[in-house]
Amino acid sequence: MNASISLDLDDQWSYMKVHGDDGWESFPSYLDIVVPLFLDVFDKLDIKITFFIVGQDAAIERNRKVLKSIVDRGHEVGNHSFHHESWLKTYSKEKIENEIEQAEEAIFTATGKRTIMFRGPGFSWSNDLLEVLQKRNYIFDASLLPTYISPLMRQYYFYKSKLSKAEKESRKELFGSFKEGFYPLKPFTWIFKNEKQ
């Protein structure tokens, strides 16, 4: 049996930002602690995975050595956006492209690898996002979370967060919809309106 394993390398500041906690702007990080632990576990298990890296973390010089160690130990790296905003799907196409490109460059600078895989923060995706990824020659996107419990996950998140009513409104599609629970669990291909099958 074949399996694909990946990990979203969401840093401390990204959780603080999404939850509405003060102090995230100083980008507190625990990457220097958790990445070596993950890598040691994966070495012991003799498995290689894909780490989806947030561009903002890769842009911070103090994180570059630990992010480079991911590639040095034989793992793949993917793009997890630059700003890790779970409302990415609400961005204009131009803003999405800027977000993807900015993360690509930061991840390349930190790791020496170009990204060809993407996962949206908070499993955020849109047709515009997929078209941007296609244009930029990405080979796969893992932003879709095919589960029926997305609305429950979102409500729990709102309950536990310190977000204002307006912030909650901007995140109302976080984790996807009930309808997305009907998408396949195995890889599949998107066909865009301007494409032929």
Regions found by a protein language model. Give the residues of each.
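Active-site beta->alpha N-cap acidic-glycine motif
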Residues: M1-R73
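Residue-level recognition of hydrophobic positions within alpha-helical transmembrane segments
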Residues: S4-L7, K95, N137
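Generic detector of short, locally flexible boundary/turn motifs and exposed helical patches
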Residues: S14-V18, F42-L45, S81-E85, A106-F108, ...
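Short, hinge-like loop/turn segments at secondary-structure boundaries
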Residues: G23-W24, K68-I70, K95-E97, Q134, ...
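Amphipathic alpha-helical segments that form well-ordered structural scaffolds
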Residues: V34-L37, V41, Q102, A106, ...
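Metal-dependent polysaccharide deacetylase catalytic core of the NodB/CE4 family, i.e.
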Residues: L45-D128, I139, S143-R154, K196
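Active-site-adjacent pocket scaffolds in enzyme catalytic domains
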Residues: K113, G120-Q197
